[in-house]
């Protein structure tokens, strides 16, 4: 089940495949690296300063990333490098994730003339 390949259609064969990004917010800094390798794996290095933001259980963030990783068949590294405010930590993780996804799903200019086919022979 390739969530990303179905969503991107023919673009999938021409995408860059991996991306990385840092995102800051005040004292917090996070890094996310995404690789649509076909091998799911989540490497989570995040220690939130609190367990909840209001009523939201921050353990659900890791569960979200596990689900995405497994459905997208991607390897994802999530590292919160600095942070004193749990809200800022969570926000920088999602900002970095969005930027890394954008990069990984963008077209690779080296592959732009390649016609998508099952064996890339066309």
Residues of each region from the PLM?
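Buried hydrophobic positions in well-ordered alpha/beta secondary-structure cores of metabolic enzymes
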Residues: 1-2, 97
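Structural preference for solvent-exposed beta-strand-turn elements
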Residues: 10-122
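Single conserved hydrophobic/aromatic residue that forms the stacking wall/gate
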Residues: 2-12
